[in-house]
Every structure is written in C-alpha cells, then in structure tokens.
C-alpha cells in the first residue's frame, strides 16, 4: 500500500525540469527528423545509382561537397539524438528510474554506432578522390570498394536501428505507464518501436527481405516521433488524472 501511494505521488507530480526536458525533446524530435531526411533525400539519395557502382562513385566524386554536407548533417543529427536520450530520461525517470536509464543507454548506443559508422562515408570519399597512393588499384576496383564501404554503412545503420527500436520501446512503455501523453500515442509508440527493432533484426538475418519491404517498416516510427514531438511542443507533459 505504501509503495502504491509513493508511485501515485510520483506519477501525479511533474517537476519544472521535466517540463523543460519535454520541450527540449519535442524540438529535438522534429529537428532531427527534418535534418536526417534532408541528408538522405537531398544530399545522398540523388547520388546513388542502384546496381551501378561505377556511376555511384562518379556521382560522389563529382558532388563531393554535397556528400560531405550530408555526412556532417548526419553527425549533427546523431549528436542531437544523444541530447534527446538524456531529455527523455529526465522526463521519465520518476516513473521508473532503472527502465528510463536502460532506454537512455540503448538510445546512446544507437548514437554511438551511427556516429562511428559515418567513417565509411569518409573512406568512400578517399576511394573516389583520385589520390596518388590509390593508383595501385584500377578504376573499377576503386569503384567497387567505394560501393562496398557504402553498403557496410547501410548495415551499420541497421544495427543502430535495433538499439533505437529497443530504447524507444522502453521509453514508450514508460510514457504509457506515466500517462503524461495520450495512451493511444504511447501505445502506437510501442508498436512502431517494436516493428523497427524486430523487422531490422529479421533483415540482418535475411538481407533479401530488405529489398522487398524497403523503408515502409520505418513509417510507423516516423509518424510516432513526429506526433510525439508535436505533442511535447504544443501540449507538453500533463499531470495524469488519478481515478
């Protein structure tokens, strides 16, 4: 009984630092989504030619600055994701400190993997740069190596997404338990996060499945993060009604 009263007291009180952290999280959700989409859709996707390593390498070499801008934007996005992990931890720590910490750690692991993974971009740039010490390789070999490292980067993203999905699942469970946001939104977050983690794991085991599903399995997560970001900015966290 004492424990129940204690949990009720925690869940029905929102500290100023939680409100600030919720606002920060809302901004980061929306900004990170916008920057990551810009980096992929504008700065990188136009350079990639599926099934044609030679043309892809030529495009990257001809648009080196644009490719670098996309890579740097990705790095800044991953840095903001670390801020998001801390902000969510601050908001949801009163609900369950240990689970909030676990979720934050998983999100930080995601940030770390994706940040290190960006080294592949700069290896690709070296391979297509025409540097003297690479003349021991012929052009086709360099183009194939560039495509290889770019493919490795794609696998690195998938590994990071597993931890993103796991961390987001736990945070969503805490959102549901706290009732700081609508339960429907929190429930959708659990669903979207599990889909991201599970489907990504399946793709890592069965790579050809990735060609079949494309990026559609990420759509639920997109709508969840945009919806949550807007809610936190417009409504903030609310005191749950205890019945």
Model-derived regions: residue spans:
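Hydrophobic, aromatic-enriched alpha-helical segments typical of multi-pass transmembrane helices
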Residues: 2-243
């Amino acid at each position: 009984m004492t424990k129940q009263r204690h949990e009720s007291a925690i869940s029905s009180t929102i500290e100023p630092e939680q409100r600030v952290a919720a606002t920060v999280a809302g901004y980061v959700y929306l900004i990170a989504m916008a920057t990551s989409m810009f980096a992929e859709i504008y700065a990188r996707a136009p350079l990639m030619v599926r099934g044609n390593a030679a043309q892809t390498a030529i495009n990257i070499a001809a648009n080196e600055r644009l490719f670098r801008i996309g890579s740097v934007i990705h790095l800044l996005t991953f840095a903001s994701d670390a801020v998001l992990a801390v902000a969510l931890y601050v908001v949801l720590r009163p609900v369950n400190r240990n689970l909030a910490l676990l979720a934050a750690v998983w999100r930080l692991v995601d940030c770390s993997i994706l940040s290190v993974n960006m080294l592949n971009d700069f290896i690709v740039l070296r391979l297509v740069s025409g540097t003297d010490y690479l003349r021991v390789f012929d052009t086709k070999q360099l183009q194939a190596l560039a495509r290889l490292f770019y493919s490795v980067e794609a696998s690195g993203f998938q590994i990071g997404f597993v931890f993103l999905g796991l961390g987001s699942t736990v945070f969503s469970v805490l959102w549901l338990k706290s009732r700081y946001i609508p339960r429907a939104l929190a429930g959708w977050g659990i669903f979207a996060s599990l889909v991201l983690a599970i489907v990504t794991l399946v793709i890592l085991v069965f790579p050809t499945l990735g060609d079949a599903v494309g990026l559609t399995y990420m759509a639920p997560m997109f709508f969840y993060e945009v919806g949550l970001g807007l809610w936190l900015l417009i409504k903030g966290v609310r005191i749950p009604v205890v019945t």
